[in-house]
Amino acid sequence: MAPARAGCCPLLLLLLLLLGLWVAEVLVSAKPKDMTSSQWFKTQHVQPGPQACNSAISNINKYTERCKDLNTFLHEPFSSVAITCQTPNIACKNSCKNCHQSHGPMSLTMGELTSGKYPNCRYKEKHLNTPYMVACDPPQQGDPGYPLVPVHLDKVV
């Protein structure tokens, strides 16, 4: 019996693993093609008046056709979140320097998946009053005319 060749298999396995991770990331963060990153941020995270998480996140899940594990809603208008982009730059979780922290505690709701398969996703709500961090980028065509617009909710502080 010939010895197994070690040259190609580890490389092939690594490539398959990387492809799998890339596909998983695309599915998790996929934004609709007809939306800018800022518009998708607004759809997912801006909710001036609190609503029940089960129905609110259901509207987001329709775009991705899967149950989102966790979603946070900021209870303030988009214009207020965009003003957060004018605070000093700080490092994001991914080490990029385009994050900004809200001026103070803000009302928000976190919805965490507890059970279900799409489209019957069920969420547990947690209401908080705490600062948040957003990643901001220059606006794209179709975005409001702010110097920077929020494109990613980086974390709740």
Swiss-Prot record:
Substrate binds at residues 68-72, 93. Its EC number is 3.1.27.-. Residues 1-30 form the signal peptide. This is Ribonuclease 8. Transmembrane segments: none annotated. The active site is at 45 (proton acceptor), 152 (proton donor). Has a low ribonuclease activity. It is found in: Secreted. Disulfide bonds join 53-96, 67-121, 85-136, 92-99. Keywords: Disulfide bond, Endonuclease, Hydrolase, Nuclease, Secreted, Signal. One of its GO terms (cellular component) is extracellular space. It comes from the Eukaryota. Belongs to the pancreatic ribonuclease family. GO terms for molecular function: endonuclease activity; nucleic acid binding; RNA nuclease activity. GO terms for biological process: defense response to fungus; defense response to Gram-negative bacterium; defense response to Gram-positive bacterium; innate immune response. It is an enzyme of class 3 (hydrolase).
